[in-house]
């Protein structure tokens, strides 16, 4: 599979016009395939034009890899076709669940137990067999740790090993969880196996109280997350890094400024 480097942008529809008109665009874009499956006409043409300008990563929302119900094989087949049709370089999903008899409209944490490791790994292996490629799983932000028997870092590493999959390391989520649970963000980063880290996410968050952050993707990246990203490059090496901005969409110039800041950190880390 082709590799890509550099900086990327989570492409939201509010950004598409600016993206298509921009003289310089990111190295890659990322979309949720669920938002584009089955669309035709103007939307399909617009999406095709976007993909022509940059490499495509796909980041799913509803696989529910940790959910209690059987995997949706029809949906996985649709994803496989979408990835092939648009020549997506990878498919990532959240290490969480979104279905419990119905769609829950949230990313809920999986109990961090040995039993859950085995269960999730079996489902990831099944998805990888069906897709014919590795799945990239993302560490998620959490606000409670139900029935935890191990740390988050231990759980993520165990799943990566058991399923032989790759990691989308979300640096903002690591920081958010460190505040919400009183954990060590840098210790989490250094515990991740560098050879399995495929790419990174960074984003802004909302502070509700001194010990509660919400991963909103609705604000600029703040200084502690920038510093954690710098440390991440130092410990695991420079990886493709994507900016997420889902709400309170700023100007294209502001988006470009954050992308350039990511690029600057990558260049500095590459010079070390």
Show which residues each predicted segment covers.
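Active-site acidic/histidine proton-transfer and metal-coordination neighborhood
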Residues: 72-167
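Boundary/entry segment of secreted carbohydrate-active catalytic domains
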Residues: 1-19
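Acidic (Asp/Glu)-rich catalytic clusters
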Residues: 19-24, 41-58, 74-89, 125-130, ...
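C-terminal helical cap(s) of enzyme catalytic domains, especially alpha/beta-barrels
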Residues: 252-272
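Hydrophobic faces of well-ordered beta-strands that scaffold small-molecule active sites
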Residues: 5-11, 27-31, 56-59, 91-93, ...
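Acidic-and-aromatic substrate-binding clefts and catalytic sites of carbohydrate-active enzymes
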Residues: 16-17, 33-45, 64-74, 144-149, ...
């Amino acid at each position: 599979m082709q590799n890509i480097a550099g900086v990327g942008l989570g492409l939201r529809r509010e950004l598409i016009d600016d993206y298509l008109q921009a003289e310089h665009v990111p190295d890659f874009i990322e979309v949720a395939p669920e938002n584009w499956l089955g669309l035709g006409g103007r939307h399909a043409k617009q999406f095709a034009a976007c993909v022509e300008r940059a490499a495509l990563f796909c980041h799913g929302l509803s696989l529910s890899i940790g959910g209690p119900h059987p995997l949706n094989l029809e949906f996985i087949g649709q994803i496989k076709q979408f990835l092939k049709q648009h020549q997506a370089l990878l498919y990532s999903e959240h290490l969480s669940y979104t279905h419990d008899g119905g769609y829950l409209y949230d990313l809920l944490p999986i109990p961090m137990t040995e039993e859950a490791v085995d269960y999730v790994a079996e489902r990831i292996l099944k998805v990888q067999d069906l897709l014919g490629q590795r799945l990239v799983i993302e560490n998620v932000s959490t606000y409670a740790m139900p029935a935890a028997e191990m740390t988050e870092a231990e759980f993520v590493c165990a799943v990566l090993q058991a399923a032989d999959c790759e990691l989308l390391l979300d640096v903002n989520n690591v920081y958010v969880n460190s505040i919400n649970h009183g954990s060590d963000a840098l210790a989490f980063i250094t515990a991740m196996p560098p050879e399995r880290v495929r790419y990174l996410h960074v984003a802004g968050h909302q502070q509700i109280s001194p010990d509660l952050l919400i991963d909103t993707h609705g604000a600029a990246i703040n200084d502690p997350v920038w510093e954690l990203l710098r440390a991440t490059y130092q410990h695991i090496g420079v990886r493709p890094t994507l900016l997420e901005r889902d709400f309170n969409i700023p100007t294209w110039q502001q988006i470009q400024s954050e992308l350039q800041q990511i690029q600057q950190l990558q260049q500095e880390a590459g010079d070390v």
